[in-house]
């Protein structure tokens, strides 16, 4: 396996264009671009720098592209997109990370040859607002899969998973293409150690099939799961569920559908909420 692409940034600078230039490195994927067989397809820092933690903040713009048979597709490291308020320079404004993935495929198939174990497609570590729209996340069984593989793993991170939309003939907006997750232990994870996280996650217009847990939240500050479909059935460990939330004080679940797979264990659940410490909807 090769090392993949590194996108170097500056943790102390924003992601906006300034005087025609960006402070941050940018990786742009389009027109059916493919990155495959990498240890980390896109790593958003310089691990060889004297202080790697100062080189975060790089930007990814990916559309109509594929990440195939990588041990990890994308790894975001801690970064906040901060800048001075234009009218009140004494104030600092925090914006979402401008990185996005639109209509992209993240897949590991039977051709994956290791030797690194596949653990997760995307790692988001202490960032906020990274967007995934109309993306497909897939995993086929192979001997190099970790015992508990994950689609998107957010650690104290904010992110959005959504479908794409178009205008219908009656003037309303309809879903054009949903995001999908298939065959993971946990498809989408939002977690944190210690205090409840402040960054929010949103999952909308997404189909989950053959996952032990579709959405798993632990110590997440605020989460929203809307207009998504969960086919519950796979079992690797414990009781499968479409949504599992623990120590998560605010979780909004609306207009979701839960069904059982044709092959399913005796115990399975649509939603499990444990020790929410607050009122959940």
Describe the predicted segments one by one.
Residues 46, 51-53, 57, 73-100, ...:
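Extended alpha-helical scaffolding regions
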Residues 11, 25-27, 32-33, 58, ...:
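Small-residue (G/S/T/A) turn/hinge positions that recur once per unit in extracellular repeat modules
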Residues 1-2, 20-39, 62-74, 94-118, ...:
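Beta-strand-rich solenoid/repeat architectures in extracellular/passenger domains
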Residues 161-163:
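Extended assembly/interaction regions that build large supramolecular complexes
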Residues 124, 244-247, 272-279:
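Exposed, low-structure sequence patches enriched in small/polar residues
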């Amino acid at each position: 396996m090769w090392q993949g692409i590194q996108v170097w940034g500056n943790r102390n600078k924003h992601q906006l264009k300034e005087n025609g230039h960006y402070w941050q490195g940018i990786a742009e994927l389009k027109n059916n671009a493919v990155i495959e067989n990498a240890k980390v397809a896109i790593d958003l820092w310089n691990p060889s720098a004297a202080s790697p933690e100062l080189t975060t903040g790089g930007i990814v713009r990916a559309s109509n592209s594929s990440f195939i048979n990588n041990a990890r597709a994308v790894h975001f490291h801690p970064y906040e997109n901060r800048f001075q308020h234009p009218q009140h320079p004494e104030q600092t404004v925090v914006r979402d990370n401008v990185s996005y993935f639109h209509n992209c495929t993240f897949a590991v198939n039977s051709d994956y040859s290791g030797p690194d174990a596949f653990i997760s497609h995307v790692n988001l570590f202490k960032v906020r607002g990274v967007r995934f729209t109309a993306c497909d996340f897939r995993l086929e069984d192979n001997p190099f899969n970790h015992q508990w593989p994950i689609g998107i793993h957010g650690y104290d991170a904010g992110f959005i998973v959504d479908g794409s939309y178009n205008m219908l003939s009656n003037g309303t907006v309809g879903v054009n293409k949903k995001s999908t997750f298939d065959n993971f232990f946990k498809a989408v994870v939002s977690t944190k150690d210690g205090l409840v996280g402040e960054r929010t996650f949103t999952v909308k217009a997404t189909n989950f099939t053959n996952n032990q847990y579709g959405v798993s939240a632990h110590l997440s500050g605020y989460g929203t799961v809307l207009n998504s479909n969960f086919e519950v059935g796979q079992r690797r460990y414990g009781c499968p569920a479409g949504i599992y939330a623990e120590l998560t004080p605010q979780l909004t679940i609306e207009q979701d559908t839960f069904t059982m797979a044709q092959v399913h264990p005796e115990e399975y659940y649509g939603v499990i909420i444990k020790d929410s410490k607050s009122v959940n909807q």
